[in-house]
Amino acid sequence: MQHEFPESDWKTFGELRLVALERFCKRVLDEVPRFPLETERSYHQRYLELFRWLGERNDELAKAFDDPRRSQMLWQLAAIYAYGLLKPDEFARFTPHTRERVQVLAQEAGWRAAQQGDDADEP
């Protein structure tokens, strides 16, 4: 797959990546107090459950945000898109061709696309 896209999309990605990162972190932190930690379990078991859950969120964060490079932009943007971290008007800032490619990649990767903008709270 070619990783060619307009320079304007790369610049937009650089701007919106930071916004999406803040939204992702806020979402995770907002979920922690609601994390189901059954009181029948020991503190250690609950800790391990939370640790495992945070590890899964960290894997998601890495997929979408670690080591941003031009060669990774489309895959990272597909993850950001699938996680519902961009508002529709923000996603619309990318060229139609890039948006289409991102949607196809997200689908091919099996990532369930969240309703764009529903969870995209302001950081």
Predicted region positions:
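Acidic, Ser/Pro/Thr-rich low-complexity regulatory regions
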Residues: 1-123
